[in-house]
């Protein structure tokens, strides 16, 4: 399977699990052995790349501000570009600017993705059953990009991905191993 083939599957799943007026959001960043693969929950309509009229990349967090604080804080993002993001409204993001942002993500050897690619209109909870439907596809995505480390965000994503109940507040900085297609990945 290729990333492009996964994208076609994600689009089909959007029709089943996501808002029918929005498009699925794929992933973005370094696709060849990134240092860190960040796995978030699922996109919302706040991501302007979910708009059917958007012609740019369909990557996580396009048109948003807060998540970029994290990448700046860990020294994995250009300060000038970070300040430019902070000063822009969502409507100020162009396809060219989104590409510039994700070129910087890739330069810093990061890969950003969501467990569920089904874009919802808002941040309403998504069931474990829906996330589980995406799990084998995320595993294929991870096997293709082959990250050095996986960082999971939130109790639900961590629990579904690791196959056990996880309370992030109780296991901060704890390493979990996850084997995908015969290779073991450290997860935090």
Tell where the protein language model's regions lie, with residue ranges.
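Short glycine-rich, acidic/polar surface loops and turns
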Residues: 171-179
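A polyanion-binding, active-site-adjacent surface
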Residues: 2-149, 153-171, 183-186
């Amino acid at each position: 399977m290729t990333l492009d083939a996964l994208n076609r599957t994600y689009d089909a799943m959007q029709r089943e699990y996501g808002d029918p007026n929005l498009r699925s959001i794929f992933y973005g960043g370094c696709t060849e052995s990134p240092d860190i693969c960040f796995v978030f929950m699922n996109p919302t309509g706040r991501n302007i790349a979910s708009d059917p009229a958007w012609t740019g990349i369909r990557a996580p967090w396009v048109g948003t501000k807060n998540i970029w604080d994290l990448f700046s804080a860990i020294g994995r993002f250009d300060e000038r570009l970070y300040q430019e993001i902070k000063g822009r409204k969502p409507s100020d993001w162009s396809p060219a600017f989104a590409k510039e942002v994700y070129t910087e993500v890739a330069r810093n050897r990061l890969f950003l993705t969501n467990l569920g690619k089904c874009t919802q209109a808002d941040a309403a909870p998504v069931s474990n059953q829906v996330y589980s439907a995406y799990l084998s596809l995320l595993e294929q995505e991870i096997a293709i990009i082959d990250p050095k480390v996986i960082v999971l965000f939130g109790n639900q994503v961590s629990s579904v991905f690791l196959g056990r109940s996880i309370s992030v507040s109780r296991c901060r900085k704890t390493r979990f191993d996850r084997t995908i297609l015969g290779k073991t990945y450290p997860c935090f």
